[in-house]
Design a protein with these regions (language model features):
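Short, charged, surface-exposed secondary-structure boundary motifs
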Residues: 123-131, 187-193, 291-292
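A structural signal for short, well-ordered beta-strand segments and their strand-loop junctions
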Residues: 100-103, 153-156, 161, 178-181, ...
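Short, flexible, basic/aromatic active-site loop/helix in glycosyltransferases
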Residues: 195-208
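Conserved donor-nucleotide/metal-binding helix-loop-beta segment in metal-dependent transferases, i.e.
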Residues: 163-195
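A structural signal for short coil/turn segments at secondary-structure junctions
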Residues: 93-94, 147-148, 173-174, 255-256
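A conserved donor-nucleotide-binding helix/loop in the catalytic core
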Residues: 82-85, 122-155, 163-167, 212, ...
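N-terminal anchoring/stem segment of glycosyltransferases
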Residues: 5-126, 282-296
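Catalytic core and acceptor-binding pocket of nucleotide-sugar-dependent glycosyltransferases
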Residues: 207-293
Length: 296
């Protein structure tokens, strides 16, 4: 925590003195406006893909705790349906998938299966400042483990699926068993020093393991390694709740199994705008929504 504060003070001082910008300047773009009102159903003409999709059961899992919608990325999504823009943009490409939300309140949305959690875990740790984030992350892991689908995908509600390349996510999961998105945070040392809600990495890696993001995450029903990994994530989150990326590294170290890393194109966050070949945008970051002309 002290390291995080020191780093943030140094960064703020550099910006104040004009030695550093808060983020790199982006070139002017000319993307067409996209919003939830101009979505049109998509039907692929790829027969091989159609056969693969029709022969596979797919479930998308959301985890929403606390009735007040709070977005850590900074966007104001309170006027949106609780699971949008993720839900609507996913349905454009996966109209026949199953959609499930884990929640501690009566979150009723048409076409979405509610799994209300009457007695959530971590009740002895409710005083922690990011308690609801810990709950949400725990049930993202848990939801995939409880899914009966061939492919289960946990995803945050503030994502915008941009194009049909999202189907690659299914093939990658089928091939590698379980996937998590890449992160711009570099090593675990950098993550611990610069992020909120972290805990020390004390294993022999000395913090030089790679860090990951948390949306989207995937699991194939056939992957025993994936199940082992996410079970360990649940176990560690219950025992020592902290930022999900920290939990996931500790789970990987203790279990000895590691997921396939999705490229940043599957979770374009603040600072990665304009990288090219984008698939899913993290529009909970206002700069991402603005860059790609997403109106939410």
């Amino acid at each position: 925590m002290i390291g995080t504060l020191i780093w943030r003070i140094k960064e703020a001082t550099a910006v104040f003195l004009g030695k550093k910008k808060t983020q790199r300047e982006q070139p002017k773009q000319n993307f067409p406006e996209r919003n939830l009102k101009n979505l049109t159903p998509f039907k692929t003409q790829d027969e091989k893909l159609n056969q693969f999709l029709s022969g596979s059961s797919i479930e998308f899992i959301f985890s929403e705790f606390n009735e007040e919608r709070v977005n850590a990325g900074g966007a104001n999504l309170s006027h949106q349906l609780r699971l949008d823009p993720s839900l609507s943009t996913l349905k454009k490409y996966f109209p026949d998938a199953k959609y499930t939300v884990y929640s501690d309140f009566d979150l009723k949305i048409k076409g979405v299966n509610l799994k209300k959690v009457e007695k959530p875990v971590l009740q002895d740790k409710k005083t922690l400042r990011r308690h609801f984030y810990h709950l949400a992350d725990y049930y993202k892991f848990k939801g995939m483990l409880e899914s009966e689908a061939d492919i289960s995908i946990s995803i945050d509600s503030d994502m915008f699926v941009l194009n049909e390349n999202v189907y690659s996510l299914i093939y990658l999961t089928e091939k590698f068993g379980f996937c998590v998105p890449n992160s711009s945070a570099q090593s675990m040392n950098f993550e611990v020093e610069t992020s909120l809600d972290t805990s020390p990495v004390t294993d022999e890696s000395k913090g030089f393991g790679t860090t990951c993001n948390i949306t989207p995450m995937t699991l194939s029903k056939k992957s025993q390694s994936g199940k082992m990994f996410y079970e360990k994530c649940c176990e560690i989150m219950e025992k020592e709740p902290s930022r999900a990326s920290i939990v996931m590294w500790k789970a990987a170290w203790e279990s000895g199994v590691y997921p396939y890393f999705l490229p940043k194109e599957f979770c374009v966050c603040r600072g990665s705008e304009g990288l090219g070949n984008e698939v899913i945008l993290h529009v909970g970051h206002p700069s991402v929504a603005e860059f790609y002309n997403i109106k939410i």
